[in-house]
Amino acid sequence: MRLLEERIKKDGQVLGEDVLKVDNFLNHQVDPELMAAMGEEFKRLFEGAPITKILTVESSGIAPAVFSGLAFHVPVVFARKHKSLTLQDNMYSATVYSYTKKVNNHISISKKFLNENDRVLVIDDFLANGQAVEGLLEIIDQAGAQLEGVGIVIEKTFQKGRELLDQRGIHVESLARIAAFEQGEVVFLDENNEN
C-alpha cells in the first residue's frame, strides 16, 4: 500500500537492526485517515470472505482492526493482555511473546464474543516472528471458530512470522512488506525487486 509505505518513510524511525518505531501514526498517536484507508484496503484484499468478526490484540492492533471492522460492517474483538476484574471466568486464553518488549503476555478473550459460528479475520500492526498471531490462532481454535485470513499492517519479511503462517496454509495479506533496514532506512520488499 503506497500511502502506508510513504508514511513509514516519512515518519517511521529505525531503531537498531530490527525495530521500526511508528508511534507518530500507528501505535501511540493514530492517523484516522490512514487507518480508514487501511481498513478499506483490507476489505478489498479479503473481498468475498464471509467474515463475521475481526480479531486483534490490544493495544496497537486496535486502531487498524476497528477501521477494518467498519469497512466490513462486523464487530471487532481484541484480546486483552492483562487480567481484568470484569473478565474472570469463561475465557479463551493463550500466551504470546512480545518481540519488542521481550516479555510473555497472557492474552484472553471472553467466550461470549467468539464462538464456533464465527468466521474470523485477524488484523495486527506488525508481523515479525508471528507470536501474537499464533496466540490469536490458538484462541480461534479454542472457540471452534474458522480463520478466514490474517491482515498485517507492517510485515518484517526478514523475520520468520510469514513463513510460519505460510506453512499452515493461511491467507496472509500485508499492507507494507519490509525487506530490510539498511543504514537507518527502511527498504521495502518491492524496492529489492523481490515478490
Curated annotation (Swiss-Prot):
Subunit structure: Homodimer.
Any GO molecular function: xanthine phosphoribosyltransferase activity
Family membership noted in the UniProt record: Belongs to the purine/pyrimidine phosphoribosyltransferase family. Xpt subfamily.
HAMAP family xrefs: XPRTase (MF_01184)
Lineage, highest ranks first: Bacteria, Bacillati, Bacillota, Bacilli, Lactobacillales
Protein name: Xanthine phosphoribosyltransferase
Keywords: Cytoplasm, Glycosyltransferase, Purine salvage, Transferase
E.C. numbers: 2.4.2.22
Listed NCBIfam families: PRK09219.1, XPRTase
Residues the entry annotates as binding xanthine: L20, N27, K156
Leading EC class: transferase
Known function: Converts the preformed base xanthine, a product of nucleic acid breakdown, to xanthosine 5'-monophosphate (XMP), so it can be reused for RNA or DNA synthesis.
Organism expressing this protein natively: Latilactobacillus sakei subsp. sakei (strain 23K) (Lactobacillus sakei subsp. sakei)
InterPro entries hit by this protein: PRibTrfase_dom, PRTase-like, Pur/Pyrimidine_PRTase, Xanthine_PRibTrfase
Catalysed reactions listed for this entry: XMP + diphosphate = xanthine + 5-phospho-alpha-D-ribose 1-diphosphate
Any one biological process term the GO annotation gives: purine ribonucleoside salvage
Pathway in which the depicted protein is active: Purine metabolism; XMP biosynthesis via salvage pathway; XMP from xanthine: step 1/1
SUPFAM superfamilies, alphabetized: PRTase-like (SSF53271)
Gene Ontology CC terms, in alphabetical order: cytoplasm
Residues where 5-phospho-alpha-D-ribose 1-diphosphate binds: A128, N129, G130, Q131, A132
